[in-house]
């Protein structure tokens, strides 16, 4: 299969995202494609290289997924102003990388907390097939505090269904949390899950959240386990629609420490 260029991908997405009310802008220097609603001025900016990497593995599925994501997001943006009061059960925390924007496309500061050296915690209002990140304007309008958002989201993430698959590779066990509800990585914030697995871990407990739709807990019982976890993390990171970090974390006594996975060696903390 020939490698797709950013321009080719942009053209393919344009052909699938045809709407008289939408404009498309391809930025060759930044390798991005922006799809914007002409009436609202709001839109989505797609970073093309990660999509190409995923397309090389799953061509049709990747394009279908991106098109669906853009349509749902633009539809949500065009809808009526979202309210959080009365929708407390629809508020969840979402993990993003520290490079994720701190403000919306309108320049309104998003509500977030620092988490680790690699990650931040943002807060989302679930809208069914999509969600909206909560911003400072929404809090002020409804007289909510950041603490209230944090507590509500923390409570809700503990109520999410847990779907786990375990694989054993070279004497190491890997637990994959994939409920495919958009909040798999958020389960990292459920302390009861971490404590439960900390009790059953026989070796070193390591954690990975390469993108928003996967959360991995590893029971590393020998040095090859670190290499395997590193390879898994990089693979998932490259294929995720919303990548977070390719680095893993050591979990010890309730604390997360980002680590480098070095080939054929034990991890080194940053």
Curated annotation (Swiss-Prot):
InterPro entries: DUF1444. It holds the Pfam family DUF1444. Disulfide bonds: none annotated. It comes from the Bacteria. Belongs to the UPF0354 family. This is UPF0354 protein BPUM_2629. The lineage of its organism: Bacteria, Bacillati, Bacillota, Bacilli, Bacillales.
